[in-house]
Amino acid sequence: MLIEVLKSKIHRATVTEANLNYVGSITIDEELMEAAGILENEKVQVVNINNGERFETYVIKGERGSGTICLNGAAARLVQVGDKVIIMAYCLLTMEEYKTHMPKIVFVDDNNKIVKLSNKEEHSECLC
């Protein structure tokens, strides 16, 4: 049996751009992608903290160190520049793999610079 679990997460990133006329996807700063273990073209779920929207898209690599979080195509209608989002990737694991799995969680500041890396979240933890 396989179970789907959190692989990685970029927590409370700030949307820097929304480009409606692009084909689709989310552009993420390469540094954030590497820290979270998110791959180019990987499917991700995006949750908009400001309005509650949840949607899936795929990742395009953005300029390293730029802080870019850009929603492209139709997804651009679901965010506004300045919104806070959570970007999550998932993986399928066997029960044996699950026992040792540690997700990568990247906490960022308002400029999308890394402030904390973790492998777990505590209940009620808030880095607001």
Curated annotation (Swiss-Prot):
Subcellular location: Cytoplasm
Enzyme Commission no: 4.1.1.11
Main location, first listed in the record: cytoplasm
Reaction(s) catalysed by this chain's protein: L-aspartate + H(+) = beta-alanine + CO2
Annotated binding of substrate, by residue: T57, G73, A74, A75
Catalytic residues of the enzyme: S25, Y58
Residue positions, PTM Pyruvic acid (Ser): S25
Cofactor note (record): Binds 1 pyruvoyl group covalently per subunit.
Keywords: Autocatalytic cleavage, Cytoplasm, Decarboxylase, Lyase, Pantothenate biosynthesis, Pyruvate, Schiff base, Zymogen
Disulfide links within the chain: none
Pathway membership, UniProt: Cofactor biosynthesis; (R)-pantothenate biosynthesis; beta-alanine from L-aspartate: step 1/1
Molecular function GO labels: aspartate 1-decarboxylase activity
GO CC, any one term: cytosol
InterPro entries per the UniProt record, alphabetical: Asp_de-COase-like_dom_sf, Asp_decarbox
Enzyme class: lyase
Family matches, as Pfam families: Asp_decarbox (PF02261)
PTM per Swiss-Prot/TrEMBL: Is synthesized initially as an inactive proenzyme, which is activated by self-cleavage at a specific serine bond to produce a beta-subunit with a hydroxyl group at its C-terminus and an alpha-subunit with a pyruvoyl group at its N-terminus.
Swiss-Prot/TrEMBL cofactor(s): pyruvate
Main function: Catalyzes the pyruvoyl-dependent decarboxylation of aspartate to produce beta-alanine.
Family per record: Belongs to the PanD family.
Subunit structure comment from the entry: Heterooctamer of four alpha and four beta subunits.
UniProt-recorded name of the protein: Aspartate 1-decarboxylase
Source organism per UniProt: Caldicellulosiruptor saccharolyticus (strain ATCC 43494 / DSM 8903 / Tp8T 6331)
Name of the gene this protein is made from: panD
